[in-house]
């Protein structure tokens, strides 16, 4: 993320930026976590959703975090803000996820550099317009993700998590 705010080189954003988690976010996450645990139903509900099982660095406690993802070649991509749980992800430390009711292990890499966030958020936005909207990314008349919006998401703490299979 940028240390200092600078003008958006891509022009004026079409949104105000990523949605801030509201008070209902934890309630929504609880419901989604439950639905993703139900055999059979998890494949329907979780077509673009999975649960990350993030282990706290200091507490050792496991946090189950439902997230939207995009499959990109052999990796999975997650567009998010730098939430506190993201700090617990480190390359070389396996991350367990549950997708389609099955646990899997991945090696996480958190991208925060402008160029990588811009490139990967565009991939995510093209694949999942609802996730793009949540991250404050609009689309131009031709249906392309708005680069000014992606830049704004990065400026406001946007990051992309790349999960590589183990």
Where are these regions (language model features)?
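Short beta-strand segments
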Residues: 47-81
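A generic local structural motif
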Residues: 36-37, 64-65, 147-149
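Short, charge-rich amphipathic segments
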Residues: 12-27, 49-62, 151-155
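Short, structured beta-strand-loop surface elements
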Residues: 3-16, 73, 81-166
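Extreme N-terminal tail/first-helix region
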Residues: 2-42
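A short, polar/charged loop/turn motif at coil->beta-strand junctions and beta-hairpin connectors
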Residues: 43-46, 157
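Generic structural "secondary-structure junction" signal
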Residues: 46-47, 87
């Amino acid at each position: 993320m940028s240390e200092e705010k600078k003008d958006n080189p891509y022009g004026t954003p079409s949104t105000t930026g990523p949605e801030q988690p509201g008070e209902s976010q934890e309630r929504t996450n609880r419901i989604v976590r439950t639905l993703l645990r139900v055999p059979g139903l998890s494949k329907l509900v979780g077509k673009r959703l999975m649960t990350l099982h993030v282990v706290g660095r200091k507490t050792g406690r496991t946090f189950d975090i439902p997230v939207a993802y995009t499959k990109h070649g052999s990796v999975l991509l997650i567009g998010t803000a730098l939430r506190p749980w993201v700090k617990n992800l480190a390359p070389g430390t396996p991350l367990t996820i549950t997708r389609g009711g099955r646990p899997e292990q991945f090696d996480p890499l958190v991208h925060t550099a402008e160029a990588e966030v811009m490139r990967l958020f565009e991939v995510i936005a093209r694949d999942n317009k609802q996730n793009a909207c949540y991250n404050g990314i609009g689309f131009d008349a031709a249906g392309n993700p708005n680069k000014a919006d992606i830049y704004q998401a990065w400026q406001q703490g946007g990051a992309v998590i790349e999960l590589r299979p183990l």
